[in-house]
């Protein structure tokens, strides 16, 4: 199967059953390729296209035919030489034929005919009579339907359709893998962000305890406790929202992995083993990236194959404008035998070709009795509007597809530029978010020290705690977005499979 996946990326072969499903990103991708329904559905299309090639090739399969008939005739005759006047005859025939169409357009037939005839006519020299004939018939088109390319055009198109199906399959795999990566990092972010929100609750509760202690000793007004308790409740609500987001991302990932939600695996929580990394690589070369995308993109290669099909169809339709001019030829060998009967008035004589059925075949293949015929058949449809219209449609469809390809090329350039720009933007976001997070930590630390000596309020401390939690979440989001922007670039360049050393079987087929 051409679209079978070859996975050589390291990882666990199957999900390991523990209290949680501990999965690295490569584990998740391996499981997705193994179980994803969308990939399996697309794979069926490649199998269908492969069978369609066989269907088109079957046009050149030979046909073996065997025909057997028996008939009886009873006729009246007015001939003075017929005896008796009521003629009765019984005929049995058994014919074998073998015919085939060859790829240049040649059609041939080998035919072997055998007949036995028995009659009550007294003028039959052989009764019963055995007739044998071997015949070869040839038809060779010279204009319309002539040539390998014309007669194999449907096969060429079917093979291109298989390639198109493989491109669709590869595109689906890239799409599913990219979606899997994004969902995985969404889950990682939601889990890490939960820690941030929980830490924010801990800070608020710690401040609440400190405020309560100061209220009890009379250094703060009771209103400060209400402020602290209100903030704790607000942050606990954020934790609840974070839990909900985790569950959503868990379900999304299980759905991609095709894990039933009521199965033992589906009832467990997925625990990602990978953390998002901020690895600054060399700047993206737009020129090289565009060339890579044009070379690799399955949707672009699919359009090119479709264009090839249009050219093949146009060439075939152009051939159909030609008149039919066929050379026809036939060559036959024949022989007879049977039981010799005396025939003749007034002196009866015997037919010299008497003998058994086998003798009839011997005479046939001796080559002494033969026939041949040769000639041509010429046909020209007046007007020929159907063929002209089909050719015009082919040319219009080709021009339309060329414009579509040009438009896709522009789209690819735009997508590559956007993906490269997004990486650079997210890199700057991470750098800025890190600075902002560090400053928020310093601001909170300074404000807490002021609070300890009575130079700040709980409101200010809570506000700085909120700022720190927001900056920590922003930094996490920026790092995840940076990793997702690299996913997008790989998808746009169609290098996703190479990243995980995933090969299509069609990539290694001759």
Range-by-range predicted roles:
Residues 1, 12, 74, 253-264, ...:
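Acidic, low-complexity, intrinsically disordered peripheral segments
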Residues 1-91, 138-153, 157-159, 184, ...:
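Bacterial Sec-pathway N-terminal export signals of envelope proteins
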Residues 16-20, 68-136, 272-282, 315, ...:
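Small/polar, glycine/serine/threonine/aspartate-rich low-complexity segments that form flexible
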Residues 40-44, 48, 57, 103-131, ...:
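Sec/SRP-type N-terminal targeting helices
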Residues 166-289, 422, 426, 446-449, ...:
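Periplasmic alpha-helical coiled-coil/stalk elements that build and connect Gram-negative outer-membrane
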Residues 190, 204, 303, 310, ...:
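Generic beta-strand/beta-sheet core signal
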Residues 436-486:
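C-terminal structured "cap/appendage" subdomains that terminate the fold
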